[in-house]
Amino acid sequence: MKRLHVHVGVNDLDQSIRFYSTLFGSEPTVLKPDYAKWMLDDPRVNFAISQGNHAKKGIEHLGIQAESTDELSDVYDRLKAADRPVLEEGRTTCCYAKSEKSWISDPDGVVWEAFYTD
């Protein structure tokens, strides 16, 4: 089953970690000096926050995290069918994980990531 991915750029990482930990009733599963991630089952979401010059404040991007390479292939086929340019990043290391990924923007510029992480 796929998992929704949301990445939010924040101004104060520590303050945001406290807020989202309280909101989700859970501590981050990944915690780095500029990044935190919660892998939640209820709701089924990969929710990440980051701080720094690289991070756009607010919604940085949304994504669909596949749980297998076959599922990623299905999602990728839908990206190609959406009649928008697809950036095929391929195998990469991002957000402290190794992933296979592609990117697309909706007609209003909202960026979506499709990825599978080993």
Specify the residue positions occupied by each region the protein language model found:
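Vicinal oxygen chelate
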Residues: L13, I64-V111
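A short linear hydrophobic-aromatic micro-motif
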Residues: E27, F47-A48, P85-E89
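Short beta->alpha transition motifs characteristic of CBS
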Residues: V6, S50, Y96-K98, W103, ...
